[in-house]
Amino acid sequence: PKEIENQLAQLDVTALLHSVERREQLPDSISTIVFESLESILSNVEVEDTFDWTFEDRDIAVIMNTSATTGQFKSVPLRWGQIRAHVQASKEVLGKTEQDNWLMVLPLFHVSGLSILLRSLYNGTAVTILPKYDEAQVLKLIESENINMMSLVPTILTQLEPSITHHKLRVILLGGEFIPMALIDACEKKSLPIYKTYGMTETFSQSVTFSVLDYPHKRDSVGKPLPGMQVRIDKPDADGVGEIHLTGPMVMTGYIDKEPIDGDLNTDDIGYIDEDGFVYILNRRKDLIISGGENIY
């Protein structure tokens, strides 16, 4: 509760919409609007087929807090221009079909989950949202062949992979933590369409990606930058290894109440770029341990 109170105070939040079970986690000092479930709200709302709304690229769409390497969170303003650029670039790499249905098991409070929802909304494709992760239900949905896209962290895919016997998956975005080579091998044998991905809240998730099935000889890399994204190695050593910097329309302008970054984001990650333009990560954010996409210190 104290962490939530600090974050709400920093962002000057004056009112909060929340479900019943979250009330005890919230400070008494803020006005709250309680609901039983999202379904109960949406079932009573009349909506039009189209929306005559204009979103300016510079307008903030959402503010997401990151658990930074110092342990002190930072607030990232994600703007509509970033999101639009990301969706268009991601679609160029991953493609789009009328049958697309993205299974979302990652949390919406994390950029990996939110990006799935907004990609699907922008593309006009389906998304299936589970209230919580349930391995049996996920496997049932995969084998029903109604799902053809997923975003997962390696820990979850390691649990699922042995039980996947048939599917119509065309994309499995995989990232957020170290990916064991044994998992890549097992997925390759089943022709599971793994796309390794590298990104962060500051870039609205996926920034670098590639298909392991298309480039098996590059399996140690995290892929190539999305269209419009540039990756450069700052202060490289004799082997070309240095700090990874990102620039492009998907990169934030700066943290809230912090100095702007002028379009150049130092990820604090260490790596290099090979002769074919594939990016390799050697050290993630000062030896940070990541579990389930969340930071552990």
Where are the language model's segments positioned?
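Structural core segment of the AMP-binding/adenylate-forming
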Residues: P1-N44, F51
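ATP-dependent adenylate-forming carboxylate-activation enzymes
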Residues: P1-N6, V20-R22, V105, T125-E145, ...
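Conserved pre-ATP/AMP-binding loop-to-beta segment of ANL
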Residues: V47-N65, Q72, G95-N101
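Conserved AMP-binding A3 loop
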Residues: A61-Q88
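Active-site loops of AMP-binding adenylate-forming
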Residues: W80, M200-R219, G248-M252, K258-P260
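Conserved AMP-binding/adenylation subdomain of ANL enzymes
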Residues: R84-N101, F109-M149
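Gly/Ser/Thr-rich phosphate-binding loop
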Residues: N148-L152, T158-H217, Q230
